[in-house]
Amino acid sequence: MAGKAAAPGTAVLLVTANVGSLFDDPENLQKNWLREFYQVLHTHKPHFMALHCQEFGGKNYEASMSHVDKFVKELLSSDAMKEYNRARVYLDENYKSQEHFTALGSFYFLHESLKNIYQFDFKAKKYKKVTGKEIYSDTLESTPMLEKEKFPQDYFPECKWSRKGFIRTRWCIADCAFDLVNIHLFHDASNLVAWETSPSVYSGVRHKALGYVLDRIIDQRFEKVSYFVFGDFNFRLDSKSVVETLCTKATMQTVRAADTNEVVKLIFRESDNDRKVVLQLEKKLFDYFNQDVFRDNNGTALLEFDKELSVFKDRLYELDISFPPSYPYSEDSSQGEQYMNTRCPAWCDRILMSLSAKELVLKSESEEKVATYDHIGPNVCMGDHKPVFLAFRIAPGAGKPHAHVHKCCVVQ
């Protein structure tokens, strides 16, 4: 039986995971990853579980097809999942189509004790009862049970296509209707460019893309419901402010390319102390001498530089972060806590929600802690991103006042 008998309501587990690394080293990383994932499942015993993956299939999807199949089969048939008798899996495998491919994978699992679960058909505009296990992987564009979009080409930096977009599904559980949106936003192409301005040019691109998604999911085409948006937002710390703080007493040396005079490296040295190098910055190098600053007290001293969400504070809510930056961890399977020196560590992987969804998460009749927001595999190599999860319970009756509106019981 999922959930503890003493805790009423429906237990929900939302997980986001950028899994690109898993398919580059499946032998070592997948076993670790699945073990840690199942552990979280065992601890929280959800009735409904959603796993949103980005970069599914890794850097080279075609070469990873067999690993993808194996991963999906393992998830669906493992002992840890045997009580989940209904599942929906949506994999964007259309890697040959530049204008459509997002490399997103969305997995939804329903516990056998959960009754009357409905999923929305966006074409028919009605809810359908969820039965059995189904996998969709060819052209998700024609699947009526979801909406998938890649961002318009002019949203992409320099209009260069990359695998960024979103997938939306809608569910009705315990008379509560809500959207679950899997999202992957744009990364920082260059540490040097990110450092130039505050906020960075990349943060502006992400802001525009996230605004686009939020506008799409509350537009006039469908009834408005609560929503959870979780994925790899690629949110970064404000680079200029972070560097100023980490290097307060340092002097900066600029290295330029001989032929173009372009800045290729910044070196920050202490004024005394034998002019010790504190930080080296290149396009894809962020080499700070003391990584502990990102781990001590879970890096929370750096949260003041995590500003990208503040623009959306009237539309999106997030529980307090008490876990270290989720990216970029070493991909060496023997290194579980080490960051790579490619980027400034940041909380890229997040679970955000609409203000009405916040009420759903925090509404509880008891005083006990109702929600857990944390990362998975703190001491184990999970690839370059640590998955992040939110576990909560939908309180009994939370959706009752709206049940007639959602027409969840009007099923085809």
Curated annotation (Swiss-Prot):
SMART domains: IPPc. Its main location: membrane. It catalyses: 1D-myo-inositol 1,4,5-trisphosphate + H2O = 1D-myo-inositol 1,4-bisphosphate + phosphate; 1D-myo-inositol 1,3,4,5-tetrakisphosphate + H2O = 1D-myo-inositol 1,3,4-trisphosphate + phosphate. Its EC number is 3.1.3.56. Isoprenylation at Cys-409 is required for localization at the membrane. It is a lipid-anchor. Expressed at high levels in cerebellar Purkinje cells (at protein level). Expressed in Sertoli cells of the testis. A lipid is attached at residue 409 (S-farnesyl cysteine). Residues 410-412 form a propeptide. One of its GO terms (biological process) is negative regulation of phospholipase C-activating G protein-coupled receptor signaling pathway. Coiled coil: none annotated. GO terms for molecular function: inositol-polyphosphate 5-phosphatase activity; PH domain binding. It is found in: Cell membrane; Cell projection, Dendrite. Disruption phenotype: Genetic deletion causes a perinatal lethal phenotype in most mutant mice. A small percentage of mutants thrive and have a phenotype characterized by an ataxic gait and progressive Purkinje cell degeneration. Purkinje cell death is spatially patterned with surviving Purkinje cells appearing normal and maintaining molecular layer morphology. Phosphatase activity toward phosphoinositol substrates is reduced in the mutant relative to wild-type littermates. GO terms for cellular component: dendrite; membrane; plasma membrane. Gene3D superfamilies: Endonuclease/exonuclease/phosphatase (3.60.10.10). Phosphatase that specifically hydrolyzes the 5-phosphate of inositol 1,4,5-trisphosphate to inositol 1,4-bisphosphate, and inositol 1,3,4,5-tetrasphosphate to inositol 1,3,4-trisphosphate. Plays a crucial role in the survival of cerebellar Purkinje cells. Interacts with TASOR. This is Inositol polyphosphate-5-phosphatase A. The lineage of its organism: Eukaryota, Metazoa, Chordata, Craniata, Vertebrata.
